[in-house]
Amino acid sequence: MRGVSVCFTRTQLMRMFPAVLSCALTLLAGLAQAQQPMPATPSAQAGSQMQAATPSQVPVAFAAAPLPGGSTRAATLRELGIDYEITLRGVQGSAGVPFSVRSDEIVTAATLNLKYSYSPSLLPDLSHLKVTINGVTVATLPTDKANAGKLLSADLPIDPRLVTDYNQLNLQLIGHYTRDCEDPDHSSLWANVDAATSLSLTTTPLALANNLALLPVPFFDMRDTRRLELPFYFPQRPDTATLQAAGTVASWFGSLAGYRGAVFPASTEALPASGNAVVFATPGTLPAQFATADSGVADIRGPTVAVLANPNDRNGKLLLVLGRNSEDLQRAATALALRAPLTGAVARIGDISAPAPRRPYDAPSWVSSERPVRFGDLVTQPSQLNVAGYHPDLIRIGLQLPPDLFVWKRDGIPVALNYRYTLPEQDNKSALNVSINESFLTTLPLTGRPFAQSTPMRWWNSLGTRGSMPVHQDLTLPVGAFSANSQLRFHFFFDRPQGEACKNTFPDVSGAIDADSTIDLSGFHHYMAMPNLAAFANAGYPFTRLADLSESTIVLPDNPGDQDLSNVLTLLGHFGASTGYPALHAQIIGAGAVQQHAGRDLLLLGSAESQPLFKQWRAHLPIGQDGQATRFALTDWLFERLPRFLSFDARRTDLPTTAEIALQPQPDDVLLMGFESPLKSGRSVVAFQTEDPANMSRLFDAWFDPTLLKDFQGSVVLLQQNNVTSLVGNQTYYVGHLPLPTWLRWYFSHHPVWLAFTVVLLALLLALAARVLLRRRTAERLNDGGGA
């Protein structure tokens, strides 16, 4: 086994000490067996084809036993961000899988459960699969003929000393199919890595200092790709103002969690027995464990933020948000959410400059609709826009669009694309493929000139200099391919040049999307038919129209319990994940104060008994208590007496209506409803109705599952067990604004009979006006003639 020389800093050595000690003990225990061959690692069968493969060059000492108190978790490739099956092609095809380790953990054992298959054409004595961690080889897997084409499984122990904070797991195929001259890109040179491949890490906690400068660590760690679960503790039942402060903090953590999702279990009984948590307290409610002078927080004289050890768990931390009253709590929460500079274990909050009021649709996570947006502003690292090699990965750009873009009579969304690439020596099949999510858009040949479909434009482009970089291309992205969270994908395909026999050296190739490329939504208005629960589930709309939720109010049920508090915090975290900004101005009230919030969008929680507004607004709900639809009298009259295309209802028609399905809600069901606010037209209400607030956790799970999230549509969603049923109600209203000429064109295009009626009416009015005018002129002429 070849030695590896590695240099470490003092901090790294301290982090690795438990792992080094564990490996040393295991090595001593294994010396007696050093001369014996390593047994094949047992592996689970995958159908009838899954077999266990024995890797070579895997040191036995690396398979260290977990330390006491350690925890083990496994993550599949999908959970690590690879949502597709990896295919390795060519003589040296490779693929990388990044993974990271939390700041408050150290790895004591690691195992890669690799599920793979390879081509039957590979020569066993010249070919193998190589697995590396951060550039260090940890295993090589043979490609014997007996197992070729089968789905194999191998458990590969990894030396935990190789695992750092940020890591790169690399899989490489060294493949050859002949001993003579070979095509390095031959179709028989392949190996597949199954998406079920998983990485298992055993970790032990690492003590961190009580230092606010580390925030949001350890309460949220960007290196952790799992869903964030952060408990909130209130020493007594919080009032609405205290809950608003907690909501600000929850929405901040939700904005940090982003795609991971976040849930916030709430408790008013006791501090969490283990792990990290957030605590809200005033002098009268401060837990006894922190009432001593040495805690540093016993004397609360104003807004205060502190990080202290969890008295129930030496490895856990508590984030304390303290104040003399609820106003102080809100100031402390705002300081946290706005990332005010904090250091030490305890920080007293002084004056905080109020942030500027948010404008509609200016959420940091949304593509701005006020100006063209650079691609460089839509990625976290400039390197994400660059690729190299003949089998490059996709360039992915996330696009979170406002859900109410008015795209009627528009060809699509304009993109000014600038891209660079290694120019082929001669014209070939090299191309840049563009797609949105899974929908193919276009192919741009890599000829050194912009692509044009019309003959005159191709002739014009041919007059330009070939190979001038960057190449500029105007694209129009069809709006039908977009979802609330879309991905614009670019794939550079480089065609290998035809070389001479046995001369297979090819030039290095690379491609890049210029960071100054732009997408422009500034020409679109905002106007949408409501209710639209797809927009709510995916983007929190209409509440997130203003990123700070300054026009949104959450209405609690009577006597809310811990689970109700948790649901409120999780919803605000969901809104923060959508906007990328904390909900600084969301209001939380009881049903009795709803009249004072008539001009705001409302979010209702509770059961038919605990939420009084469900009874007060029964006539306005899209579905009644008996499961039947409710309509306004005028709408009934129109549906009964006029053709459907004359109706004001321009909703989508591919969903069943609430009148067409007899619902029989069960106690475990969750009913999600959207309707226009009875208090003010143009304002929206979204209501969650369930007998047990704990059922809401299943709805949140559905939101985090893309296969279920897409089923949230229409104005009513019924969650029964794990089934999502979407219905469309019979009331439609519109939010947003259109210029009058645009609104008239849109309205009459959807209601041709009303257009005809309006034209006839205008013709009659013009005829009447002309008749009156002509009679007046005739009378004047007769009067003039009589006077003569």
UniProtKB/Swiss-Prot annotation:
Annotated compartments: Cell inner membrane
Keywords: c-di-GMP, Cell inner membrane, Cell membrane, Cellulose biosynthesis, Membrane, Signal, Transmembrane, Transmembrane helix
Transmembrane segments: 753-773
UniProt signal peptide: 1-34
Segments in the Cytoplasmic topological domain: 774-788
Ranges in the topological domain labelled Periplasmic: 35-752
Record family assignment: Belongs to the AcsB/BcsB family.
Protein name, as recorded: Cyclic di-GMP-binding protein
Organism in which the protein naturally occurs: Xanthomonas axonopodis pv. citri (strain 306)
